[in-house]
Amino acid sequence: MILLGAVVACAAGIAVGRHVARHVGRHGRGAATGQGERGGILIGDTAAYDAMSRLFFGSLFGPIAADVAAVAEEVAPDGARVLEVGCGPGHLSIRLARRHGLDTTGLDLDPAMIGRARANAEGAGEGFGRLPPGRLPSFLMGDVASMPFGDGSFDVVVSTLSMHHWADPAAGLAEIDRVLRPGGRTLVWDFRRGFLPFHGRMPDPVGHTRGTPLRLVGATPWRWPWGFSLIQRIELVRASG
């Protein structure tokens, strides 16, 4: 059953990816800094990215949310504030709020994605249902290198499939360290550099992660082949100091 679900999600993701690839081919690439582009997909094509995220990566968010919730309970048992960096259309933040009751904030550079995330959280997005007003995640536009939050604002910072897009990983991780309270935790899930063609123009995060408590996980909890190897994770954690 799990294998079948993965195959179906993969096929759906490929179909959406083909549509988006045609869109990119017609309209060109985004800025070199990563603005206007998310992994070769124009962020302006918000509906296509939302569909791809839901279908291709949706099965990952359940285990990831459970892991984040466990860490949140460990570091702040009386109630944790969680920040998702690079939230996109908000699927993980919504799950953290709905299933785990966490006070969650999502940050993304693209205003269209923030609009999509807010709509999804309010129940306009297919399949989410409605959240009580007090449990709605907050979604804000901002750059990981200069976040609109005070020092020590969050107990847990999580990022999924975002770090390889950051124009300046060192600046981003320094900001995460700033907004993370003492004793807080950072969790990162990502593809290893070089797995996908567009990774060749992305900065390598290894060596640029000093200054924050960092836990780097593979692309999924199941350690699929495109996740970071154990050696790569050790190197990145060592580089983070």
Q: Which functions belong to the PLM regions below?
A:
Residues P221-G241:
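Core SAM-dependent methyltransferase catalytic element
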Residues V156-A167:
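A short SAM/SAH-binding and catalytic strip from SAM-dependent methyltransferases
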Residues H199-P213:
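Short alpha-helix
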Residues A170-P182:
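A short glycine-rich, Lys/Arg-flanked "PGG" loop and its adjoining helix->strand segment in the class I
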Residues A6, I14, H19-A76, H91:
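Conserved class I S-adenosyl-L-methionine
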Residues L83, P89-S146:
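Class I SAM-dependent methyltransferase SAM/SAH-binding core
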Residues G184-D190:
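Conserved beta-strand signature within the Rossmann-like core of class I S-adenosyl-L-methionine
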Residues A145-V156:
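A short acidic, Gly/Pro-enriched loop at the edge of an enzyme's catalytic core
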